[in-house]
Amino acid sequence: MGTDNKSKVEARASARYFKMSANKARRVINQIRGRSYEQALILLEFMPYRACYAILQLISSAAANANHNLGLSRANPFISEAKVDESTLFKRFQPRAQGRGYPIHKPTCHITITMIEKT
């Protein structure tokens, strides 16, 4: 009748206000979700998108957090959760003809990676 209160041991890393559209970052995140740490590194190294480098650094940071804070080895972790959330827009104006201003919206996003040890 009692519930098992085992807490998952997970390491997390997040990048906030990353200057990229959420859809462009999701295109990369969807490829690595549920994969092991080593598979994700190999995939990100050879994908041709600009978001890959930042996500590669984020995965390395999550693995370092797992190693340092939780004592997990770098051999077994896998990406249990990877999400991209939209953030605020940087709003700018581009000067146009006859004194008008044309709005420029520069999107940002929050990227969160959660890793757990595969048993």
From Swiss-Prot:
Where does the signal sequence lie? none
Q: Name one GO cellular component term.
A: chloroplast
The protein's GO terms of the molecular function aspect are:
rRNA binding; structural constituent of ribosome
Q: Which SUPFAM superfamilies match?
A: Ribosomal protein L22
Q: Which InterPro entries match?
A: Ribosomal_uL22 (IPR001063), Ribosomal_uL22_bac/chlpt-type (IPR005727), Ribosomal_uL22_bac/org-type (IPR047867), Ribosomal_uL22_CS (IPR018260), Ribosomal_uL22_sf (IPR036394)
Listed under GO biological process in this entry are: translation
Superkingdom of origin = Eukaryota
Sorted UniProt keywords? Chloroplast, Plastid, Ribonucleoprotein, Ribosomal protein, RNA-binding, rRNA-binding
Q: What is its main location?
A: plastid
- Give the record's subunit note: Part of the 50S ribosomal subunit.
HAMAP family, sorted: Ribosomal_uL22_B
Give the UniProt family note. Belongs to the universal ribosomal protein uL22 family.
Question: What does this chain do?
Answer: This protein binds specifically to 23S rRNA.
The protein here is known as Large ribosomal subunit protein uL22c
Q: What species was this sequence derived from?
A: Angiopteris evecta
